[in-house]
Design a protein with these regions (language model features):
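Intrinsically disordered, low-complexity linker/terminal regions across diverse proteins
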Residues: 1-165
Length: 165
């Protein structure tokens, strides 16, 4: 990477936001979600279809609105984490903050190794083939030079080739 691109990468890392645990507020669309029990004629499919419709209608109503950066892409009960390039943020739902990823009774080294790996993994997505196409504000902006992108793609392909044997 050129020095100029490295500086942009550092700026992107420094401006990255972090969400941990759960959102401060639930989206209003969550209040419209519903589950009809099987005993009342509901089914997994019918419940999924009704709630997908609610989600689609909610998304359509937001078209043209300013991006709500407070929204989460996962529920707190989800044992996962993610990097969102459009918001330049990493998100750690509450459920991942338990063993084996985090244990308040464990040695610091154990937690650093476990949850630290997850954190580093998510940060790395800010600079992978997809994340590198978004700037520190979450705008689609290819800030790597063509040569840097080509070199990255070549190195990535060499790893794919090596592990595909």
């Amino acid at each position: 990477m050129s020095d100029a691109t490295k500086q942009k990468a550092i700026r992107k890392l420094e401006t990255m936001s972090v969400k941990i645990g759960y959102p401060d507020e639930w989206p209003e669309s969550m209040d419209m979600m519903q589950v009809t029990p099987i005993s009342e004629g509901g089914s997994l499919l019918s419940n999924m279809l009704v709630n997908m419709q609610v989600s689609i209608e909610d998304s359509l109503q937001k078209l043209g609105d300013e991006v709500d950066r407070s929204l989460w892409g996962m529920t707190p009960q989800t044992i996962n984490a993610y990097y969102d390039p459009a918001n330049n943020e990493i998100v750690f739902p509450a459920a991942i903050l338990q063993s084996p990823f985090y244990n308040p009774d464990a040695e610091d080294a154990v937690n650093i190794g476990a949850i630290g790996f997850v954190i580093a993994h998510e940060i790395s997505h800010a600079f992978d083939a997809n994340g590198s196409k978004y700037d520190e504000y979450g705008n689609y902006n290819e800030w790597w030079t063509q040569e840097e992108t080509q070199k990255y793609n070549e190195l990535s392909q060499s790893i794919v080739d090596y592990y595909s044997k």
